[in-house]
């Protein structure tokens, strides 16, 4: 599996697919942690490419991914 992060001089990182633009405090080899505001109306922090919980109140499946902008499917 390829490295999900692209290291830059500032120490921040971006997801290889460019879906995460707010990644920070990420070390090379680690997954970017990004917070998206559009996950069932809640701010959700999850690892890019992995499922995160939208939380209670979601009308539908409560799983979401950073890759899809943390939008419930």
Swiss-Prot record:
> Which UniProt keywords are listed?
Cadmium, Metal-binding, Metal-thiolate cluster
User: Which residues are noted in the entry as Cd(2+) 2-binding?
Assistant: 20, 26, 39
| Upregulating conditions | By cadmium.
- Binding annotation for Cd(2+) 3: 28, 32, 34
| Residues reported to bind Cd(2+) 5 | 48, 52, 54, 58
Positions contributing to Cd(2+) 4 binding = 46, 58, 64, 72
Per UniProt, where does Cd(2+) 1 bind?
A: 15, 20, 34
> Where, if anywhere, are coiled coils annotated?
none
**Superkingdom to which the source organism belongs:** Eukaryota
Q: Which positions are annotated as binding Cd(2+) 6? A: 54, 66, 70, 72
In terms of InterPro entries, this protein maps to: Metalthion_mollusc (IPR001008)
Entry's Gene Ontology molecular function annotations: metal ion binding
Q: Family, per the entry?
A: Belongs to the metallothionein superfamily. Type 2 family.
Its function, per the record, reads: The metallothioneins are involved in the cellular sequestration of toxic metal ions.
Name it.
Metallothionein
Q: What is the native source organism of this protein?
A: Dreissena polymorpha (Zebra mussel)
